Amino acid sequence: MVLIRVLANLLVLHLSYAQKSSELVIGGDECNINEHPFLALMYNSTSMKFHCSGTLLNEEWVLTAAHCDMENMQIYLGVHDKKNPNKDQQTRVPKEMFFCLSNKSYTPWDKDIMLIRLNSPVTYSTHIAPFSLPSSPPTVGSVCRIMGWGAITSPNETYPDVPHCANIEIYDYSVCRKAYGGLPEKSRTLCAGVLQGGIDTCLADSGGPLICNGQFQGIVAWGRHPCAQPQLPAFYTKVFDYSDWIQSIIAGNTAATCPS
């Protein structure tokens, strides 16, 4: 697992944060096959290893985490069981990728977001449909849905063929600051999980959606490994804060900048 830390507090943060780019939902159950038509599966076409998920915004655009950037990326839409493809499953590759910063810089609490333009539009179908951007931010205490093909056990990871889903809760950012230490006072992330432990996103869930009250509110970003430990919620990029940037890029303003 790749670990990324802030230079000023390198040792502490190196022990605290881990990308969820190879994680699945711990403590969940198989998602209903009709529950995730917007969910994208992201592979390295050379190694044929699954690394991340993403969310389809419209026929041409997928939103995911910046740390999901990889060589030889293939994006699968309409997938449920990886070993038994749906008839309407479609595959695309990136045509363009957009980051908040030209040097692709991001931290566990800022700008871990990537917008991908597909090489050709997908066709909507029974198992392929978009998810709109949120109209308002989520509130503390909201119950949210997580989903993905990431690890279902940790630290000895096992990976399912079908996506798993589970419910977690939004906490005040101060809960994550207390749990991890060394975090800035403000962040464009959501703090979410189950403080009792046992339920969490995990390796290879990165880039997937956090859905609160029917709205796409977060992107799976960072958390502690092993996954699903008590008192250690995870971080999700706050989609609402980046809505203007996302809409500007999709509209053709490729010079648009992310919120500071």
UniProtKB/Swiss-Prot annotation:
Keyword Ribosomal protein among UniProt keywords: no
Q: Span of the secretion signal?
A: 1-18
Residue ranges of domain Peptidase S1 in the record: 25-251
**Which parts of this protein are propeptide?**
19-24
- The answer on whether this UniProt entry bears the keyword Signal reads yes
Please give the tissue specificity annotation from the record for this chain.
Answer: Expressed by the venom gland.
Q: Which Pfam families does the annotation name? A: Trypsin
One CC-aspect GO term: secretory granule
GO BP annotations listed = proteolysis
- The record's active-site residues are H67, D112, S206
Task: Kindly list the places in or outside the cell where this protein is found, as annotated in its UniProt entry.
Answer: Secreted
Q: Which UniProt keywords apply?
A: Disulfide bond, Glycoprotein, Hemostasis impairing toxin, Hydrolase, Protease, Secreted, Serine protease, Signal, Toxin
InterPro entries the UniProt entry points to: Peptidase_S1_PA, Peptidase_S1_PA_chymotrypsin, Peptidase_S1A, Trypsin_dom, TRYPSIN_HIS
Q: Which domain of life is it from?
A: Eukaryota
Q: Which GO molecular function terms does the record list? A: serine-type endopeptidase activity; toxin activity
Disulfide bridge partners, by residue number: C31-C165, C52-C68, C100-C258, C144-C212, C176-C191, C202-C227
Residue positions with a glycan: N44, N103, N156
Family listed: Belongs to the peptidase S1 family. Snake venom subfamily.
Q: What is this protein called?
A: Serine protease VLSP-1
